[in-house]
Amino acid sequence: MKNLFNIIGFQLSWWACVLGVKYGYSYFGPLLMFLFIVIHFSIFKSQISELKLIVLFAFIGTIIDTAIANTGILIYNGSYSQELLIAPLWITAMWCGFCATINHSLSWLKEKWILCFLMGAIFGPLSYIAGEKFEAISFQSSFLTVNIVLAIVWGISIPLIFFLNSKIQ
């Protein structure tokens, strides 16, 4: 039951981030994601190591998505400004929420490196496609180019999250 809350809470918060941007409330999603993480920690009595992972990937994830934006292949809507190419808060919130699933609803992926790579390479781009369909991001390059880049980035990121999680534990 706890893992069900974990994945549903993350998914609801993820959609709140995307739809919040679409409808001009770009801070609604991050607030809901913060609430999800607070409730998550009260339910799971998570260890300090999990908090370290979440904070670490708040930074790493923001850097990754900032780098993606700076390649010019996509634009994040709901950003701080169009001139400042830093991934917006709602993207950082998504990274934090995703990391809260690693030791719980996604724990079955631990040490399954090829599966982690495949899951990242497939579902990472699908998340961005959904974000693009709901106008949270705009692709600036061809659909194929954007998705090849995202597949590579997420194919590496998911195993990296699990690897660093194992080192932090």
Segments predicted by a language model, with ranges:
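Aromatic-rich, lipid-facing transmembrane alpha helices and their immediate juxtamembrane interface loops
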Residues: 1-169
